[in-house]
């Protein structure tokens, strides 16, 4: 079963991802929705998560720092960046952090 944390500050995007995942995948549980990096870190510490969908441009702690933190706390979790930015520097940083996938 996928236990997913969605990290996205835009409510419409967050809700769309949640609905899409729940309607199209079997064995999915959305265990948390974070609107900021701070909320994401709190949820990483307190919830059973094995897949993270992380936006890069979020308030507080940015998405890359959330990913870095998640990699330390949840080394086996799948981490997917969700972003509207197609900047090479973001992709390069994501590779260094061993992100599993990158969705534009």
For the regions a protein language model found, what residue spans apply to each?
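Class I S-adenosyl-L-methionine
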Residues: 15-22, 45, 71, 92
């Amino acid at each position: 079963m996928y236990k997913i944390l969605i990290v996205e500050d835009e409510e419409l995007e967050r809700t769309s991802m949640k609905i899409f995942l729940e309607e199209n995948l079997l064995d999915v549980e959305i265990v948390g929705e974070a609107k900021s990096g701070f909320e994401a870190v709190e949820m990483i510490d307190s919830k059973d998560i094995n897949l993270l969908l992380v936006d890069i441009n979020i308030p507080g702690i940015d998405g890359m720092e959330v990913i870095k933190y998640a990699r330390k706390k949840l080394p086996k979790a799948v981490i997917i960046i969700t972003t509207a930015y197609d900047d090479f520097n973001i992709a390069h940083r994501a590779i260094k952090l061993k992100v599993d996938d990158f969705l534009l």
